[in-house]
């Protein structure tokens, strides 16, 4: 069905097509949806039905949680959500590079605020594994950034299976500085202390996950993993989008500002994943994302060290069948 819809959707502005696709999910007939049986994965104290989940960014506010659940994901990550709602960057801010199965976005954490997301999650019927990705508001300076993350963490704790700390988006000014040295250590210190309090308050432990940039040096990644191991962070998502354009040079829209995702990100993000595996071994769960649009690319991520996978841009180009193709292919190995 998606192969019939895609040419029509691709005639629309990318952000309009995104919104329309999410709306259409609510009206698809029941026979289109199916459960996908896979090999369970035990990670971060959770049992994932199979390896393939949805990356953050598709449903920022949790408005489409039940519809997305019917596509067969092992887990769904909502967000990025911030303490207060914000409009994000001016439009247009989402661009396809169809020649390369790629997307450039400079959305800028557009979302309705954490309170709206929580209410949407509470209304949903979804009972599966839910990640919630949290960030800071654009106007919050770096010295106060930890307060934004703590505020969101407290709000979502009782509704999340795990919480992702997004400090690697290229579309919020200076955000990636939070991956550096003292900023990073202080942020994790405060979040870990809050995690202990919240676990006692709610009677359950919710793992923290860090989403990293593919554009950091090997030295920075090593410093980050040392701090991650020190503070007992249980997961790393590798990776966010890249600012590099080497892989799409001279293609239409390639000069647009923002983060590049999709197939051209595959090599860079997988290299980062492989490096992280060397640094953390089996002590931290690695979630591979970036360029997964086939069984082969999924296998490459797993071989590089990923226990779990996330897709987003691959869905735009391949449709929901991508989930089934990957899971059934991994089952056959």
Swiss-Prot record:
Residues reported to bind FMN: 56-60, 80, 133, 166, 211, 239, 262, 291, 312-313
A GO term for molecular function: dihydroorotate dehydrogenase (quinone) activity
Coiled-coil intervals, chain numbering: none
Matches recorded under Pfam families: DHO_dh (PF01180)
GO cellular component, as recorded: cytoplasm; plasma membrane
Cofactor dependence: FMN
Catalytic site: 169
EC identifiers of the protein: 1.3.5.2
Pathway listed: Pyrimidine metabolism; UMP biosynthesis via de novo pathway; orotate from (S)-dihydroorotate (quinone route): step 1/1
Record flagged with keyword Flavoprotein: yes
InterPro entries: Aldolase_TIM, DHO_dehydrogenase, Dihydroorotate_DH_1_2, Dihydroorotate_DH_2, Dihydroorotate_DH_cat, Dihydroorotate_DH_CS
Family stated for the protein in its record: Belongs to the dihydroorotate dehydrogenase family. Type 2 subfamily.
Protein name: Dihydroorotate dehydrogenase (quinone)
